[in-house]
Amino acid sequence: MKKHSNKALAIVIIFSLFVSTFPNISGTSYSDIQIDGNLSDWDSSDFLGQRNGAGFALTWSEDNLYFYWNGTDFYNDIEGADIFLYFSTSNSGSNLSKSWNFVEHNLPFSANYGLSIEDSNYYEFVEWNGSSWNVIESEDIELYIGWSGNKASEIKLPLSYLGNPSNISLMAWAQWQHEANVWSSFPMLNSASETGAEYFTHYYSTALEEDISSSEIQILSNSLKLDDAINLAIIFHQHQPYYSSCLA
């Protein structure tokens, strides 16, 4: 009996060492993230890219969407920024963002909801009512906003605010704090010209299910020119793993 117990213990120890040596690298969703400015509970494959010094990531649980934006001090009057997230859950939304600093951006989809964040002291969650953007109560949204000592921002958005969709399309961007000049946007195929109103063309689209990693989130376009070989080559090169999986 003791001999079998020793074998069982050895198997448990070996299995534990194997798991610790090869941690989960799939980055699948259904993650619960603590909104505290500490990114250690994020998986590396939740990461969607980095542009002009800002990193962007997305994951979700059964009840919430989670985002991080890393690399920006939102309280700096000179280098600070405002961040925007827009969401489409149906075709009955608006193709223009809510005016901010007197500028509206063209969106790549019909957006039903938007989140605009200046800093932890002020943000707006808006819903399209068919003719205009309305600010609605959003006390359950949780934020940690990056500052000079920790430039990692985290956002928790309850899915109930979006009508508990099973699929979602979204995009994000940051613009100057006191102007509407966009300096970073995601997906990264979008413009970020820092010149005012933008015409965004690309967005993320995904089912909100378990076992989906960032590499499986689709990047779609509302204005892809099929006769433009250069654009097609760029898109295929940047997203080759996704297209390869489609062809397999």
Where are the language model's segments positioned?
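Extracellular/luminal beta-rich ligand-recognition
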Residues: Y30, Q34-S44, D77-K151, S193-G196, ...
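A recurrent domain-boundary module in secreted/ectodomain proteins
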Residues: A174-S223
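Secretory targeting signatures
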Residues: M1-S29, F67, I155
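A short beta-turn/strand-edge loop motif at beta-sheet boundaries
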Residues: D73-E79, Y161-S166
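Low-complexity, acidic Ser/Thr/Pro-rich repeat tracts that form intrinsically disordered stalk/linker regions
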Residues: I25-D32, I219-L226
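Short, well-ordered beta-strand segments enriched in hydrophobic/aromatic residues
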Residues: G37, N64-T72, A152-P158
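Carbohydrate-active enzymes and regulators
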Residues: S221-A248
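Ser/Thr/Pro-rich, low-complexity mucin-like regions
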Residues: W147-E194
